[in-house]
């Protein structure tokens, strides 16, 4: 079923109910009474039929299922939510952290009480959504979020144990690391020293990765091995705190605020747990324990009866900040004089800028070269080339946003099916010499599931949400044009983070590319690996696997379906 959907009925959103192959549990029907097969009663005291238990699909079912193409939002909303965050905070007294006498170290209190350390990471796209909603800059939105999660007027004010998040970090920090490592991956692939097949496809979008794993396994060797900024931040937090403070990863609870519901699915991947970086091979503790969206952040405030719009738009006092236990990583995560909150240039887009940085990183290594842009068939398809000063094309790359465009890319990368006839040509080889895929000669492709990129994620605050419609005059509902204008406002808020005149602490390095120093990033990552005693590759890279579902089927049924498909030329 999924193959039919992906080829013919693909849309930018397919709810789980359309293609889910895990059927709702069928309970045995109640046996009719032998005495009264049919009964009509007007007696109001008659017993009501017993309530059936609600049907549920667990996250495990979702991860093991190949029925859905993408967008597991409806299933995951109930599993990772603002209610779960509050439940965790109110479950036990938290571990208390205090500054040491020197002001750079950390002392721990309350280990024996069974509590946890709470850490939050916030994406720039979520800050932009909040900023557009409340008419503030992206930077001010970040301060408001920090006050909500850590400040005295935030969620701790009405909490059972007055627990709050000890650190609120910006995922732009790990985004910069991902940009540098991603660019290095591209260059390594061109030199033949990278195991990922060309073209390398970005893998920071979980909706796209989920789709590839479940319906197009032939593209998995092309996926970038880099972790996403969310995943990399989770690994950095769990490894460093567990090593430095001498506590187990399960006592560090990390929530991420993201623009996308599919990020909940990413956080649940078995490849992103402590079992991977510890190498235990057992079922591990997640690097990111929970993900809430921009919408759910406001629900978090409402649940504590906090008026988000009245939260301070200034930073928390420096005296309230607990230093991260490692001074080098503390400077990396909380830079005092670096443009860490910059979301990149407008040309980089609002999805992190992987492609933009890789192009300029490559161009910086070829003196006199320039980056040229070629617009595609729509706004979400763009081709790029790096051209030498003599006119030679050094590198080709592209941007594909939205599943309709992604489907075209995937189709071009699909290898020809071998013919079953002796001596026959591969099926579809008329335009595929030697039966090879006719994929474009791209070196790198930035792929995102959402049209318009991450600021248009499914978890963002929309123009027709009550908090926005309450401001509109009349009863008219916002239409597509209003949604387009709203997305433009969110994008504008996203790039308002660039309005910083603070100088970079790495400006004295001579290798800056788009304001980021690759040598500084590499030195910091090397320090992280040394501090934790773990191999850097195990910390920053991940893996992918084809998802073949047995959910709702027994082995005999599956074998018969495959046999029939082979007989009729299904090519499964």
From Swiss-Prot:
Entries under InterPro entries matching the protein: Cytosolic_Fe-S_CAF (IPR050340), Fe_hydrogenase (IPR009016), Fe_hydrogenase_lsu_C (IPR004108)
Q: Does the keyword Disulfide bond apply?
A: no
Superkingdom of this protein's organism? Eukaryota
Signal sequence span is none
Extract one GO BP annotation from the record. Answer: iron-sulfur cluster assembly
Checking Pfam families in the record gives: Fe_hyd_lg_C
Alphabetically sorted, this entry's keywords are: 4Fe-4S, Iron, Iron-sulfur, Metal-binding
Provide the binding site for [4Fe-4S] cluster 1: 20, 62, 65, 68
Which GO molecular function annotation, any one, does this entry have?
iron-sulfur cluster binding
Task: Spell out the residue ranges making up region: Disordered.
Answer: 416-436
The reply on keyword 4Fe-4S is: yes
Q: Which residues bind [4Fe-4S] cluster 2?
A: 205, 260, 450, 454
What this chain does, per the entry, is described as: Component of the cytosolic Fe/S protein assembly machinery. Required for maturation of extramitochondrial Fe/S proteins. May play a role in the transfer of pre-assembled Fe/S clusters to target apoproteins.
Q: Which family does it belong to?
A: Belongs to the NARF family.
Quote the protein name from its UniProt record.
Answer: Cytosolic Fe-S cluster assembly factor NAR1
Q: Which organism is it from?
A: Botryotinia fuckeliana (strain B05.10)
Q: What is the lineage of its organism?
A: Eukaryota, Fungi, Dikarya, Ascomycota, Pezizomycotina
């Amino acid at each position: 079923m999924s193959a039919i959907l992906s080829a013919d009925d693909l849309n930018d959103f397919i709810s789980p109910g359309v293609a889910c192959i895990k059927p709702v549990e069928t309970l045995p029907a109640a046996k009719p009474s032998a005495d009264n097969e049919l009964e009509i009663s007007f007696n109001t005291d008659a017993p009501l039929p017993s309530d059936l238990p609600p049907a549920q699909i667990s996250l495990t079912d979702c991860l093991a299922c190949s029925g859905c193409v993408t967008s597991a939002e409806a299933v995951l909303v109930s599993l990772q939510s603002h209610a779960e965050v509050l439940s965790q905070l109110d479950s036990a007294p938290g571990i208390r952290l205090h500054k040491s006498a020197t002001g750079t170290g950390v002392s721990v209190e309350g280990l024996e009480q069974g509590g946890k350390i709470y850490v939050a990471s916030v994406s720039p796209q979520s800050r932009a959504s909040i900023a557009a909603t409340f008419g503030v800059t992206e930077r001010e939105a970040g301060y408001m979020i920090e006050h909500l999660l850590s400040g005295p007027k935030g969620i701790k004010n009405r909490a059972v144990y007055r627990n709050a998040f000890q650190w609120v970090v910006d995922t732009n920090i790990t985004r910069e690391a991902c940009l540098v490592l991603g660019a290095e991956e591209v260059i390594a692939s061109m030199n033949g020293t990278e195991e990922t097949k060309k073209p390398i496809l970005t893998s920071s979008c979980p909706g796209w990765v989920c789709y590839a794993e479940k319906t197009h396994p032939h593209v998995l060797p092309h996926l970038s091995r880099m972790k996403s900024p969310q995943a990399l931040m989770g690994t950095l937090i769990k490894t460093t705190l567990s090593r430095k403070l001498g506590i187990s990863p399960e006592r560090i609870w990390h929530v991420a605020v993201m623009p996308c519901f599919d990020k909940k699915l990413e956080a649940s991947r078995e490849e992103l747990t402590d079992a991977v970086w510890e190498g235990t091979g057992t079922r591990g503790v997640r690097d990111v324990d929970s993900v809430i969206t921009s919408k759910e952040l406001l629900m978090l405030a409402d649940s504590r009866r906090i008026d988000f719009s009245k939260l301070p738009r200034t930073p928390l006092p420096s005296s309230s900040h607990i230093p991260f236990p490692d001074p080098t990583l503390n400077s990396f995560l909380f830079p005092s004089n670096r443009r860490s909150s910059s979301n990149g240039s407008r040309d980089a887009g609002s999805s992190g800028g992987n492609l933009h940085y890789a192009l300029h990183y490559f161009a910086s290594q070829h003196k006199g070269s320039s980056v040229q842009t070629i617009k595609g068939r729509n706004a979400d398809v763009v081709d790029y080339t790096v051209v030498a000063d003599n006119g030679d094309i050094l590198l080709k790359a592209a941007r594909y946003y939205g599943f309709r465009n992604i489907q075209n890319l995937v189709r071009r990368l699909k290898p020809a099916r071998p013919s079953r006839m002796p001596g026959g040509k591969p099926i579809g080889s008329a335009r595929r010499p030697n039966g090879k895929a006719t994929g474009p000669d791209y070196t790198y492709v930035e792929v995102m599931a959402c049209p318009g990129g991450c600021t248009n994620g499914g978890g963002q605050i929309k123009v027709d949400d009550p908090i926005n419609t309450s401001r509109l005059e009349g009863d008219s509902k916002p239409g597509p044009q209003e949604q387009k204008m709203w997305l433009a406002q969110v994008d504008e808020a996203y790039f308002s983070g660039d309005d910083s005149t603070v100088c970079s602490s790495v400006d004295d390095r001579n290798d800056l590319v788009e304001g980021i120093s690759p040598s500084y990033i590499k030195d910091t990552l090397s320090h992280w690996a040394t501090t934790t005693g773990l191999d850097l590759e195990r910390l920053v890279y991940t893996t992918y696997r084809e998802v073949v579902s047995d959910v709702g089927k027994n082995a005999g049924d599956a074998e018969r379906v495959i046999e029939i498909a082979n007989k009729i030329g299904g090519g499964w």
